[in-house]
Structures are given as C-alpha cells and as structure tokens.
C-alpha cells in the first residue's frame, strides 16, 4: 500500500460496548454522617438498589434493598432496634443479613437471609466492597486514611455529588492521563505531568500554572505561582488528591485534600462524588476556614461540571487516536481492566509497575503563545461550557 493510499484512509471510531460487569473493589457511598441518622437510605448502585442504615448500636449496615419475603423496599421501612423493618409486612432484618423477627409469625424461616455488603468507615466516609465473585476484601486493598482527617487544623469535609447519565465511569478514570484537557477544559497550564501505575493504584503527578487569559475563570493574580497535585486512585473508583501551591496567599489558595470518587449505577450511569477539606490558615477562625472550604468546593464543582459537559456530548471510544503529547491512555485502560475480570484472570501487565512522563516542551510553547495572543487582544479563555458548568454547579449546591 502506498503512502497516498494510507493518507486517504478514514479513521473510524470503535464505540465498543460498556461492560455489563461492575468493577471489583471498594466504592465510596458518601459521608458517614449523612447515613448515621437512624433512618434507612436507598442507594442505587451496581445495577440494583441497596439500603444503608445505622441501628441503635450506631453501626452502619448495607443490605440489598428488596425484602426476600415479598419484595418490599426496605429503604421505605424504618429502623427498629438494630434491624431494618420492611414496610410491607414488618419483617425485620439484621445487619448480618439474617431475619431477626417476624412479629406475626411463630418462627422465622431458616432460609430468611438477604445479601449483606462488606462495609468500611474510613476518614469519615462509608465504603462498600463489590466483587462479582463474592470474595471478601483483601487486607492489602484497604482504603488508606486521609492523614489530616480529624486534625483540628483542618476543616471537615465539604461534600457534593452529581449523577452522570449516558456515560460509563471509565470516562472519569481516563482523566488520570489526560494532560491536555487541563488546559482546554479547566484553564490550567500543566508544566509537568507524570503517571505511575502499580498494583491497584494509579497516580498522576502534575505541576501547573494559571492561565493569564482566564479572566473570570481563575482567581489567580500571580501567574508564576505553581500549583501542585499528587493524585492517586486506590482501586477502580476512589482517588485522594493532595493539592498545594507555591507563592500564593494561603487564604485564597490553601492546602487542600480533594476526594474524587464514584460508584456505578448502571453500565451507562454513575454517581460522581467529590469532597474537599482545607488547612486552616494561621490566625483564621474556624468559621472563616469553613467559608474558605466552601469556596474551594464551589470551584471544584465547576471543574467537575466542565468534565460532565464534555462526557454528555462525546462519543464512547475504544480506539482513541493519540499523538506523542497525549498520555498513556491504553496503558491506563489496561490497568483499569484488572477490576473487570476474575482475580485469576488478572495478567501481570495489568499490575506491573509502569511509569510515563510527558514531554511538555511543545505543549507549553503552543499554549503560552495562545495565552499571550489572547492577553494582547484583550480576549478571555472563557468558553460556553464554563457557563453551563457554573450553572450546573450552582444548581447542585442549591445556591
């Protein structure tokens, strides 16, 4: 085949099919405080419905939502003692999945047992373990603590969530390697970008500068002040991101821990959750620190809504066409695949250590020229998707 024939070939998109299977691993359902109120809570996840409740002993439990008697929804019932009572016939289920009592019956049938989900409470967050093979969670896959949680020098979590429809949760995981989208979607300018995948973790190390043409987007005034981000996925759906800055006002850009997590609802929908805690600047009272955290969370919300706007309108693509300055998308997806196969089918290349650093030289030259041109012309990098993202973030926060 000649070069002309090759150049005339049209690249087609392979949209593939989202997996029907849900990822094995720990998934964060939200904050403990939001579930520990003595009421049942319904969570739609993993293609089914769950009920989360805390009994009189304060222990949080997660069961299948539908009663094994006649299918009543336990999330519509009530907590009685250390059981969840079905609203249909008052069958009462313990956190271990056994039916403890049927008030109108002489005895409880021996087979009266429902599915219970392994849970963990870490850094004020509630996790459930999902495994299609039914295995117990291995100790080496435990979710790590956020080191500053509970530290009086830091705020508590400011937490938000978005239901994303029409997309598989692989879309958000792809962002781990996507350096360029931080410039075009989030109005940052990455100066250093590196990935490390090993075992069940995937890490992104990024250093970036604010864009001087991002008028109305960035609050930065010192455009040489570097932002730093060390972000790691622990398993398929839970990321801890440490964010800090050099040469900035600690009140406007404090040290931050950001949680970026999600759980699948269906093969084409998921609930995206994100939380922030900030270090209280010296001399700043707790109330003001909470206001700072709220402001940071609002900025984070806009950033995630920018991503959602892209996902809502893009095609699924299993064969992305990449250039040299793109990140290791295929290697990341190979790492991600380990959570969708049986444990015995995990291949060494899915979990072996892999490192990749993007050469940012060409990108920075191009981006700086674009920024300089916009500044000289008095143009802003402000884009329509930012307006939509701000409106969505405002609606999510109820403001």
Curated annotation (Swiss-Prot):
UniProt EC number: 1.14.13.-
- Name what cofactor the protein needs: [2Fe-2S] cluster; Fe cation
Residues that hold Fe cation according to the record: 175, 181, 186, 307
Residues noted as binding [2Fe-2S] cluster in the record, renumbered to the chain? 67, 69, 86, 89
- Write out the GO MF terms: 2 iron, 2 sulfur cluster binding; iron ion binding; monooxygenase activity; oxidoreductase activity, acting on paired donors, with incorporation or reduction of molecular oxygen
Give the classification, highest ranks: Bacteria, Bacillati, Actinomycetota, Actinomycetes, Mycobacteriales
Query: What InterPro entries does this protein's entry cite?
Result: Cholesterol_7-desaturase, KshA-like_C, Rieske_2Fe-2S, Rieske_2Fe-2S_sf
Function noted in UniProt: Could catalyze the introduction of a 9alpha-hydroxyl moiety into the ring B of 3-ketosteroid substrates.
**Manner of cofactor binding, per the entry note:** Binds 1 [2Fe-2S] cluster per subunit. Binds 1 Fe cation.
Where are the disulfide bridges?
A: none
Q: Which organism is it from?
A: Rhodococcus rhodochrous
Instruction: Describe how expression is induced or repressed.
Output: By cholic acid.
Q: Which Pfam families match?
A: KshA_C, Rieske
What's the protein here called?
A: Probable 3-ketosteroid-9-alpha-monooxygenase, oxygenase component
Kindly indicate whether the keyword Metal-binding belongs to this entry.
Answer: yes
Domain Rieske intervals: 26-128
Q: Which UniProt keywords apply?
A: 2Fe-2S, Iron, Iron-sulfur, Lipid degradation, Lipid metabolism, Metal-binding, NAD, Oxidoreductase, Steroid metabolism
Any one Gene Ontology BP term:
cholesterol metabolic process
Q: How does it assemble?
A: Homotrimer. The two-component system 3-ketosteroid-9-alpha-monooxygenase is composed of an oxygenase component KshA and a reductase component KshB.
